[in-house]
Amino acid sequence: MGAQLSLVVQASPSIAIFSYIDVLEEVHYVSQLNSSRFLKTCKALDPNGEIVIKVFIKPKDQYSLRPFLQRIRAQSFKLGQLPHVLNYSKLIETNRAGYMIRQHLKNNLYDRLSLRPYLQDIELKFIAFQLLNALKDIHNLNIVHGDIKTENILVTSWNWCILTDFAAFIKPVYLPEDNPGEFLFYFDTSKRRTCYLAPERFNSKLYQDGKSNNGRLTKEMDIFSLGCVIAEIFAEGRPIFNLSQLFKYKSNSYDVNREFLMEEMNSTDLRNLVLDMIQLDPSKRLSCDELLNKYRGIFFPDYFYTFIYDYFRNLVTMTTSTPISDNTCTNSTLEDNVKLLDETTEKIYRDFSQICHCLDFPLIKDGGEIGSDPPILESYKIEIEISRFLNTNLYFPQNYHLVLQQFTKVSEKIKSVKEECALLFISYLSHSIRSIVSTATKLKNLELLAVFAQFVSDENKIDRVVPYFVCCFEDSDQDVQALSLLTLIQVLTSVRKLNQLNENIFVDYLLPRLKRLLISNRQNTNYLRIVFANCLSDLAIIINRFQEFTFAQHCNDNSMDNNTEIMESSTKYSAKLIQSVEDLTVSFLTDNDTYVKMALLQNILPLCKFFGRERTNDIILSHLITYLNDKDPALRVSLIQTISGISILLGTVTLEQYILPLLIQTITDSEELVVISVLQSLKSLFKTGLIRKKYYIDISKTTSPLLLHPNNWIRQFTLMIIIEIINKLSKAEVYCILYPIIRPFFEFDVEFNFKSMISCCKQPVSRSVYNLLCSWSVRASKSLFWKKIITNHVDSFGNNRIEFITKNYSSKNYGFNKRDTKSSSSLKGIKTSSTVYSHDNKEIPLTAEDRNWIDKFHIIGLTEKDIWKIVALRGYVIRTARVMAANPDFPYNNSNYRPLVQNSPPNLNLTNIMPRNIFFDVEFAEESTSEGQDSNLENQQIYKYDESEKDSNKLNINGSKQLSTVMDINGSLIFKNKSIATTTSNLKNVFVQLEPTSYHMHSPNHGLKDNANVKPERKVVVSNSYEGDVESIEKFLSTFKILPPLRDYKEFGPIQEIVRSPNMGNLRGKLIATLMENEPNSITSSAVSPGETPYLITGSDQGVIKIWNLKEIIVGEVYSSSLTYDCSSTVTQITMIPNFDAFAVSSKDGQIIVLKVNHYQQESEVKFLNCECIRKINLKNFGKNEYAVRMRAFVNEEKSLLVALTNLSRVIIFDIRTLERLQIIENSPRHGAVSSICIDEECCVLILGTTRGIIDIWDIRFNVLIRSWSFGDHAPITHVEVCQFYGKNSVIVVGGSSKTFLTIWNFVKGHCQYAFINSDEQPSMEHFLPIEKGLEELNFCGIRSLNALSTISVSNDKILLTDEATSSIVMFSLNELSSSKAVISPSRFSDVFIPTQVTANLTMLLRKMKRTSTHSVDDSLYHHDIINSISTCEVDETPLLVACDNSGLIGIFQ
């Protein structure tokens, strides 16, 4: 712009700089970035974000910038294609100034060097590598930058470098050596006096000769400047030259190697790299390409060249756009780029196996060696095995396994891990996580960060990864919050070293954030709190370990004199930590949600260890013992399963005073699973020796009656406890003390081991006996059997002993002894009826009431000699039953009761409430609102197709007419027509015709904008017989969706009579007609209406539907179509609506239309009027570019369904009546694309065949996949059809094996019944065994069978199919397999089929070729193109076969 420009430019502008910006359209001035005299740099906003504007204020109005701007524009256009360059996107000249505009980035390289976290060595190397590649690309375009410095190198948040502010046409090439003012004016805009210019650019002679602008910049000048930049970044921001040092260096009076490089750089390779770039002689400076080749594998790691750089360059190009021709920028907006980071994160996730291979991460192939080549895309799994709860599975598209280890262990073996190259990916992922839109992608990002964190040092784990996990605590999605918490703990678990800056990370940073996370989620769902509670103990372990690290470092770094100070600070820090963890623990212990408490209990032992014995007693145990009274038995079970471990930690005193008495009381819990857990815990405590001998006898007396309990687990654990006690006692103690207690419960004396004792235990009482005993204990009133004796005896746990009345005791105190008048009066009116004996031969008196109960026991199977068993269980049952009695939901009287872990549902008292029947009536609105009732009756009579309606007007016994027949549609009751109202004395069941209570608007044209040619929608009125005024009931009744059956919809026409399937056994294969009207357009689908007037429907790839009158064609009267309908798009499928003159058509534009064929009888001829569109829907409303490729229709009194398979392998089910979408079934993509479908005769089962040879069986009632299998060589399955001849559970499968025509399977049992082999060689039986496991791991056959079948048709016991290669048609006879034959074949060979019984369940039909004639075959009688569709029908009792091929030819065979 002129060598002497510095002399004429104003020292300061006459007006404020923002006034120059205001003249620009759609630009808002923000601030001024520098105060340079040459170019004023401002920050502004435009519609697409922040921009930088460099303003050149013209020294005079006539000063023209056009030649400069043209050259800058041409240069920017070339540079716009490079990912390392940020060019000027807009250049503007006004009469006062020139403007160069580009995008604004926050940081340049100079700023980044001083920001935390500081760049690591591998990142500095990668930045230098990027800059050399960027400069190489620029020089390859014959462009020179001219002003490379750290301020002109922009850096993204993940350290991708971008060169900007090219100065070749803006600033002078040469500067005077004696005037530093020129350098300050043009190049020292930051006023740091740092010089990056090559020494040869300071040349006074060339400057004075006027070549400062006309001189040519050289590539060597850029190399020198870049060498200065690389030296500065490795010197932690210290510049290699200022202006005076550069002059000294030029005069050889400054030794840069000794005075700078040796001081700042330890690496000899780095020093040599810089020296090769800053040589005084430009010719000795190496080019970028030479530098990269020379230092490959020496200074720059080899994986920079082979993988890393290219991979990140691809990521950059994914997030940017390339300018179109003649433009320097694109108009990409922020809205367009909102999901770009989602795409790049997904790419890293998909490419993880490739990343591991290229960086030598310890990736192990499942069943293979380290680093082996990946197989074809299947499944990839990473298992994190560092922490107890973090055995997380990450799924990637490769079949590999990664065992993550501590950094120190891996870095010793692998160079790339030691260099921490994973930091490059961590920088990218961590800075993108907050801008990711999709929750699923954000979860993948967290998983990747957790995995990559294992390959960086402990310091970088904390500084570079942990903050981003913590920032995800603020995310609105609980899945993200929970996974961020899990990954945080996982990463911290592997940390083994701490630096001084991170010593207080928990107190100052993590714990306050965790508390805030917990508080902020109080009002949300419990998922996060459950995860947090489960992780708390692991967090406590990490905190404890960090404390140990900190203390050890202080002891090593300080002298003994400072030990007191260290101890004090450590004590304060520990107190804060313990208090914070205590607050979190109490919060979880007192949480309102049971599952949060259970999650804490699952891993509470490390937390107890963290607090120590005293604090555990005060904080944890005091809360835990209250859980035994909780209503939720699952919580009680969790506590009891944990309590034995806590007991070991707390010791015998706490066990005997608190824990053991509570466990003994809990043996009588109402839930048997709780009792099992108690017995299991007692067994563990006995085994560890924590329970002293003084408790053995009382525990034996309490538990030994449980050997008669009906629960098998309770009996076994009771026996295990007895065996543990026996092992702890001496032989004398066993036989003198324990043996008398347990002997009654065994048949005979045995050895004291589990196997012997379990085999000779007395038979337990049955469940019905036990439940009746519980019921008796609660309901007993005048009973001596349950009468307890008041006693002051207590056992060793402080519980009162239970003693019952015996005959001796009652005789002494109640029956004959008059001294105890108080006790006698309490039994007044009670008379003994008989006695029973206990297991210790004591007589127990019974009252008459007791005797009645005993008789009940006899009735349910308890013999008289086994009555002692219920006597022995009295003490246990009376405690258990009292607990049950406190629970109003417990079913005492149900003899079939089986206890469950979960609480029983609320027991509503329905004793005096009778069920109420509510009837629904449904009719079309125009019928219900019409004034003339006669016309309604007429219409109803026209559409009476159900035989049950014929007797609907018969009189009942009382002479009144019966109500009309009620039918069941979708689980609700409706009337077929109105009847005269009746009265009855039972007001709960009266039906009265009410006014319409709700209108169900069902549009048959859902989702369409243009419905001009579609039948208008019809309103349906639904009324019910409810006469009450309870709002909740009325609201509930209004939720029922009731529709009339399809036969009541007039637009579908009258229902056809059931026409039997044609008898194809008489088919001879004679060609009687050839229709060529459709040539050369391919016929893609066809169908035949089987009614009284059979007609053929064909659809072509041009979207034309044609209707053909088969009767007239056979007679020879016409050979053209009767009707034509244009669908405007390729027809993919035609399917008939059963029992109606209507059919459904799907096309590639996403449309599904239902057409009705209108025709009438004129004398003996049938005249076709038109095709009327009665329903229409567009699948593009549900999915982009989606259309149906297969359809099936099903109609009965309850359902009218249209099942459509789309090109996206989704199955969509519609209601034919309204074309409303009912459900979507999405099959697993791992099973392959769905290629064929069929439904069973009850429309409950959907059968899918896939391109990977897998058969999937779905229950469409519950949208559940119930079975999948493959067989053979897994060839693609092209057709599946229901085979009713062999039963409702049989399905015909074409495909799966390249050796068969087809196979017939029982899809319920999953075995092959028949196999139709396409050769005379019998395959192995294993070929037809179902493979149900490991379907995703099978090697699938990607090609179809050589004898591929193009289409199939099933008619009763006949299966007709076409051979794609020969266009022959084969007919298999299921009734007589040996009579199967090729009915239409152009070959000189005939097929002979030989049935072979292989097993009782499998029959094979082998095909054998046999020459039939030596004469030539008349080719005109056969199809010469692929047959796309075949159909069968019967006209005047003559079976017909209609075949339509790819050339548009229709052949009719008789």
Curated annotation (Swiss-Prot):
<dbReference type="GO" id="GO:0034271">
    <property type="term" value="C:phosphatidylinositol 3-kinase complex, class III, type I"/>
</dbReference>
<feature type="lipid moiety-binding region" description="N-myristoyl glycine">
    <location>
        <position position="2"/>
    </location>
</feature>
<keyword id="KW-0813">Transport</keyword>
<keyword id="KW-0967">Endosome</keyword>
<dbReference type="InterPro" id="IPR045162">
    <property type="entry name" value="Vps15-like"/>
</dbReference>
<dbReference type="InterPro" id="IPR011989">
    <property type="entry name" value="ARM-like"/>
</dbReference>
<dbReference type="InterPro" id="IPR055231">
    <property type="entry name" value="VPS15-like_hel"/>
</dbReference>
<keyword id="KW-0067">ATP-binding</keyword>
<dbReference type="InterPro" id="IPR000719">
    <property type="entry name" value="Prot_kinase_dom"/>
</dbReference>
<dbReference type="GO" id="GO:0005524">
    <property type="term" value="F:ATP binding"/>
</dbReference>
<dbReference type="GO" id="GO:0051365">
    <property type="term" value="P:cellular response to potassium ion starvation"/>
</dbReference>
<dbReference type="GO" id="GO:0034045">
    <property type="term" value="C:phagophore assembly site membrane"/>
</dbReference>
<keyword id="KW-0677">Repeat</keyword>
<keyword id="KW-0449">Lipoprotein</keyword>
<keyword id="KW-0072">Autophagy</keyword>
<keyword id="KW-0597">Phosphoprotein</keyword>
<dbReference type="GO" id="GO:0005770">
    <property type="term" value="C:late endosome"/>
</dbReference>
<feature type="repeat" description="WD 5">
    <location>
        <begin position="1344"/>
        <end position="1382"/>
    </location>
</feature>
<dbReference type="GO" id="GO:0045324">
    <property type="term" value="P:late endosome to vacuole transport"/>
</dbReference>
<feature type="active site" description="Proton acceptor">
    <location>
        <position position="147"/>
    </location>
</feature>
<feature type="repeat" description="HEAT 2">
    <location>
        <begin position="576"/>
        <end position="613"/>
    </location>
</feature>
<dbReference type="GO" id="GO:0006623">
    <property type="term" value="P:protein targeting to vacuole"/>
</dbReference>
<keyword id="KW-0472">Membrane</keyword>
<dbReference type="Pfam" id="PF00069">
    <property type="entry name" value="Pkinase"/>
</dbReference>
<keyword id="KW-0333">Golgi apparatus</keyword>
<feature type="repeat" description="HEAT 4">
    <location>
        <begin position="654"/>
        <end position="691"/>
    </location>
</feature>
<protein>
    <recommendedName>
        <fullName>Serine/threonine-protein kinase VPS15</fullName>
        <ecNumber>2.7.11.1</ecNumber>
    </recommendedName>
</protein>
<keyword id="KW-0723">Serine/threonine-protein kinase</keyword>
<feature type="binding site">
    <location>
        <position position="54"/>
    </location>
    <ligand>
        <name>ATP</name>
    </ligand>
</feature>
<dbReference type="GO" id="GO:0046854">
    <property type="term" value="P:phosphatidylinositol phosphate biosynthetic process"/>
</dbReference>
<dbReference type="InterPro" id="IPR011009">
    <property type="entry name" value="Kinase-like_dom_sf"/>
</dbReference>
<keyword id="KW-0808">Transferase</keyword>
<dbReference type="GO" id="GO:0045053">
    <property type="term" value="P:protein retention in Golgi apparatus"/>
</dbReference>
<feature type="repeat" description="WD 6">
    <location>
        <begin position="1422"/>
        <end position="1454"/>
    </location>
</feature>
<dbReference type="Pfam" id="PF22956">
    <property type="entry name" value="VPS15-like_hel"/>
</dbReference>
<dbReference type="GO" id="GO:0016236">
    <property type="term" value="P:macroautophagy"/>
</dbReference>
<comment type="similarity">
    <text>Belongs to the protein kinase superfamily. Ser/Thr protein kinase family.</text>
</comment>
<feature type="binding site">
    <location>
        <begin position="33"/>
        <end position="41"/>
    </location>
    <ligand>
        <name>ATP</name>
    </ligand>
</feature>
<dbReference type="GO" id="GO:0034272">
    <property type="term" value="C:phosphatidylinositol 3-kinase complex, class III, type II"/>
</dbReference>
<keyword id="KW-0653">Protein transport</keyword>
<comment type="function">
    <text>Serine/threonine-protein kinase required for cytoplasm to vacuole transport (Cvt) and autophagy as a part of the autophagy-specific VPS34 PI3-kinase complex I. This complex is essential to recruit the ATG8-phosphatidylinositol conjugate and the ATG12-ATG5 conjugate to the pre-autophagosomal structure. Is also involved in endosome-to-Golgi retrograde transport as part of the VPS34 PI3-kinase complex II.</text>
</comment>
<comment type="subunit">
    <text>Component of the autophagy-specific VPS34 PI3-kinase complex I composed of VPS15, VPS30, VPS34, ATG14 and ATG38; and of the VPS34 PI3-kinase complex II composed of VPS15, VPS30, VPS34 and VPS38. Interacts directly with ATG14 and GPA1. Interacts directly with VPS34.</text>
</comment>
